[in-house]
A protein has these predicted regions:
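Beta-strand-rich domains and repeat architectures in extracellular enzymes and scaffolds
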Residues: 35-69
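Blade/loop signatures of beta-propeller domains
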Residues: 20-40
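Short coil/turn segments that connect the beta-strands within blades of beta-propeller domains
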Residues: 56-58, 96-98, 140-142, 200-202, ...
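A flexible loop/linker signature enriched in serine peptidases of the S9 family
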Residues: 23-24, 44-45, 63-69, 83-88, ...
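Beta-strand-rich domain onsets/edges
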Residues: 321-336, 345
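C-terminal functional module detector
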Residues: 344-363, 369-372, 380-389, 395, ...
Length: 841
């Protein structure tokens, strides 16, 4: 909660930021990388992530905390097998028990390596800088199947000869096929993933979306030789995690499925396809199944307790036992660091925070039970890996390699970012206390600014199993007050549907509120955030999904907004634009309904800061404001609350709203957003006052004159620009302190026409620890009325006329409408909006 008077702060971001932060494993050429990176590629977790059986079915080799470990089922002791460089995942154990094949993430690639269990030596089996994953030995141990992006950056299956820890004669088994299907979340290029050998070694089972629009596809079999014809044996919608495995008798297979439910469980079906059924149940994920060689057990990874864990289930029987490494035998000297984070004002009390810990080996470390998170992009010139972090309640203990340890601690935007180094000796405990010093933000007893993130997904098909109480803990670590969990579908399922309620979540506290709203997930008109639905969840929760009963472009977003407003909800456009839309260009296609809905009064806010390009979104926002529409900014991270690889923590993009100084309630906060008493930020804090009016207010003038302003900046990172923007143009560049982290300027600007002004701040490049494209902050407008003249812009009106003409043309030619009445109602709505912009001339 931030308490100070707000004047108007505006933030602008530069394209230069893109040149520095680039996606993790950027060599993969597929759309929507945040999905396949989290759901398919291995991620660093403090708990186990995948396992393989010994031939006698008494031991497992598994990946945990970025290393490979071996553990007997009857023992609580785990033996570390690898310790870098890099992070090691996805082990597979050869039938002769000598070799373990695994995937190592290092040097901006994932390569396959082999581990000789006789002497502990590792050998690199692939090179070239591609992403190579899911290695699987043939039953005789002489061949290795795996998935690689080495051909054009797409996921295909390869097979090579394995001998003495090395691969040779590697060939692509599945050819590249470009589909004409209208896929939204998946590439036009078919993928093939998750290979599994038949027990005689003659064929390979895999998962592919060949011939399918939605999901990662069905199950296919192919002879294990290039040029062979594959055939589909079973189809159901999958989502990167099916990972089938044959029973040792070769007659059955086990895989992970969410068929008819919201969570993955273990399912079995005949090896040649047929009717499947589940063999595990629960409101959590059981994934990565591996059948034991003796056929009596299945090992799998579960997130039933939140973090990942390794389990074994008897088959038949159903008894499940967790495999826990209560004792760990490390390959190198280790010590422990006891970390305590406190508030500088009340040092006797621990406070929640976000923590980055790097060992002397350059790798990331976390407590054994902590959820590890990874940034989805990073600057290669600054670090070899993306930033990894975890949340602490204020007291944590971390096992790290002996030597120097780097510790970074962050607690939202109202405390300074703290960095420390400490030496940890082998077999000893080093104590570290970090005091979080608050920013010197001027406090005004008449103001009360409360932070919130209006775009959060508590569970969204990720690695972990999140709960409302844990989401509150995540918010506390970021010093974030309000969380709007937008319940939404991921393909067929809606993971958090059971939590939807018009009421405040019971996990809320006096300092943190959690509510469950909805994101309406059209694949055409643009996504909507629906805050404070007071009656029901809107179903179906999406539109324009080809080859489904929701293929029609109806309901359009205007219809959805009407339904939401009938429930008293706020409606906002979320993560609007990755680039500035140009209606004069044929491509990319323009389908966003935003300008039409704004003109018709359907939109209560826009995420100027969101999972999009802030500067491009702001340009469109300015044009809408220039047409006389009053549209406040909010901010939403699109935080995937159960992801291990994600675009920043909850509250990365947050909105501050001015509310009365009273006990925390949601109603005044939502009212403040609708009234425009807000500023949005991913770091810099703003204060803006214009003509005596605060953000969301209106300055009324009789004529052109100099108008007084007051602007302040408080930032935990340097920013390059602090500007007042009026009617889309920079009215005043403001000078900051020498560190570029603060400013307090009083002055005047000339105002001679009706319109608006905002204060914005931004940097030209990324600034750690802000895990976003670049630091950016903007206030909502202070509106200006001169002689009562309306706000009009012929040029911007013409821009939106051209935009809506594109929408009308596409809607007329679309053939997916259920009825002519649907089509005509949407066309009529678009035409009505067009006329409003046409009158701007």
């Amino acid at each position: 909660m931030l308490k100070f008077r707000l004047v108007c702060f505006v933030f602008i971001a530069c394209v230069a930021g893109f040149a520095q932060r680039e996606p993790v494993l950027k060599q993969i050429d597929l759309p929507h990388p945040y999905y396949f990176r989290e759901m398919y590629l291995p991620q660093l977790t403090s708990g186990p992530s995948s396992a393989a059986w010994s031939q006698d079915s008494y031991s497992l080799v598994y990946s945990m905390a970025g290393s490979l470990w071996r553990q007997e089922l009857r023992s609580a002791k785990a033996e570390q097998l690898t310790a870098g460089p890099g992070y090691d995942y996805q082990p597979d154990w050869s039938s002769d028990q000598r070799w373990v094949a695994f995937a190592r993430y290092d040097h901006d690639a994932i390569e396959l390596w082999s581990l000789d269990l006789r002497d502990g030596q590792t050998r690199k089996m692939t090179s070239g800088g591609a992403v190579n994953v899911e290695p699987r030995f043939s039953p005789d141990g002489k061949r290795l199947a795996f998935v690689s992006t080495s051909y054009k950056g797409h996921f295909h299956i390869f097979v090579g000869r394995f001998d003495n820890g090395l691969l040779s004669d590697v060939r692509q088994l599945t050819p590249e096929n470009v589909s004409s299907l209208p896929r939204y979340y998946y590439s036009q290029v078919d993928h093939e993933i998750s290979p599994a050998w038949t027990r005689d070694g003659s064929e390979i089972l895999f998962v592919s979306n060949r011939g399918h629009i939605h999901g990662t596809g069905g199950f296919w079999r192919i002879k294990a030789e290039p040029g062979a014809e594959a055939h589909e044996i079973h189809y159901e919608e999958t989502n990167w995690k099916a990972r089938p495995d044959f029973s040792p008798d070769g007659k059955r297979m086990v895989y992970a499925s969410y068929l008819g439910q919201s969570w993955h469980q273990l399912w079995v079906m005949p090896a040649e396809g047929g009717d499947a059924f589940p063999i595990s149940y629960g409101s959590f994920d059981n994934v990565n199944p591996r059948w034991s060689p003796d056929g009596s057990k299945i090992a799998f990874i579960s997130n039933r307790n939140g973090n990942t864990s390794l389990w074994v289930q008897t088959i038949p029987g159903g008894e499940q036992t967790e495999v826990v490494a209560r004792e760990r035998k490390y390959l190198k000297p280790m010590g422990r660091m006891s970390l305590r984070v406190v508030d500088d004002l009340t040092p006797q009390h621990p406070v929640a925070a976000r923590v980055f810990v790097a060992g002397t080996d350059g790798l990331a470390y976390a407590p054994d039970d902590a959820w590890m998170y990874a940034d989805d992009s990073f600057d290669r010139s600054q670090r070899p890996f993306e930033a990894h972090y975890f949340d602490t309640s204020g007291v944590s203990e971390i096992t790290v390699p002996a030597g120097n340890v780097e510790v970074d601690v962050m607690r939202g935007f109202e405390n300074h970012f703290e960095q420390r180094k400490i030496e940890v000796k082998a077999d000893s405990i080093a104590q570290l206390t970090v005091r979080m010093a608050p920013l010197s933000v001027e406090v005004d007893s008449t103001s009360n600014w409360v932070s919130g993130d209006v775009h959060v997904h508590m569970n969204y098909a990720g690695t972990y199993r999140n709960t409302p109480s844990h989401l509150i803990e995540q918010a506390a670590a970021e010093n974030l007050t309000i969380v709007e969990d937008l319940v939404v579908n991921k393909e067929q399922r809606i993971p958090d549907i059971a939590y939807f309620s018009p009421q405040l979540d019971p996990a809320s506290t006096a300092d943190h509120l959690l509510l469950h709203g909805q994101e309406f997930h059209t694949s055409y008109w643009g996504h909507l955030g629906l805050l404070n639905l007071t009656k029901s969840f809107l179903l179906p929760g999406y539109a324009a999904y080809p080859n489904t009963a929701a293929a029609s472009l109806y309901p359009a977003n205007a219809n959805v907004a009407d339904m939401a407003h009938q429930q008293g909800a706020l409606v906002g456009y979320v993560h609007p634009f990755d680039s500035f839309p140009d209606p004069a260009q044929e491509y990319p296609l323009i389908t966003s309904e935003l300008p039409a809905d704004v003109a018709l009064g359907k939109v209560d806010y826009i995420e100027v800061l969101g999972f999009s390009d802030h500067k491009s979104t702001a340009e469109v926002w300015y044009k809408l404001l220039n047409c006389g529409f009053r549209l406040p900014t909010a901010a939403g991270t699109d935080f995937m609350g159960n992801y291990a690889s994600l675009r920043g923590p909850v509250g990365l993009n947050r909105v501050y709203a001015e509310v009365p100084r009273e006990p925390l309630k949601i109603e005044p906060w939502l009212a403040a957003i609708k009234a425009g008493r807000t500023f949005a930020t991913n770091g810099p804090l703003l204060y803006f006052l214009l003509g005596g009016q605060g953000i969301g207010g209106e300055v009324r003038l009789e004529k052109k004159q100099q108008v007084h302003f007051s602007a302040k900046l408080f930032s935990i990172v340097p920013v390059d620009h602090l500007q007042i923007v009026c009617n889309g143009k920079v009215a005043r560049e403001l000078t900051m302190n020498s560190e570029r982290t603060g400013a307090h300027i009083d002055g005047t600007i000339p105002l001679g026409a009706s319109g608006w002004c905002v204060l914005r701040a931004f940097s030209d490049k990324a600034e750690y620890p802000i895990l976003d494209l670049y630091p950016y902050s903007t206030t909502s407008p202070v509106y200006v009325s001169v002689s009562g003249a309306p706000v009009r812009s012929a040029a911007d009106g013409a821009y939106f006329v051209a935009w809506i003409d594109r929408l009308i043309s596409a809607a007329r030619s679309n053939t997916s409408w259920n009825t002519e009445a649907e089509k005509q109602s949407v066309l009529s709505m678009l035409q009505e909006a067009r006329e409003k912009y046409a009158k701007m001339k």
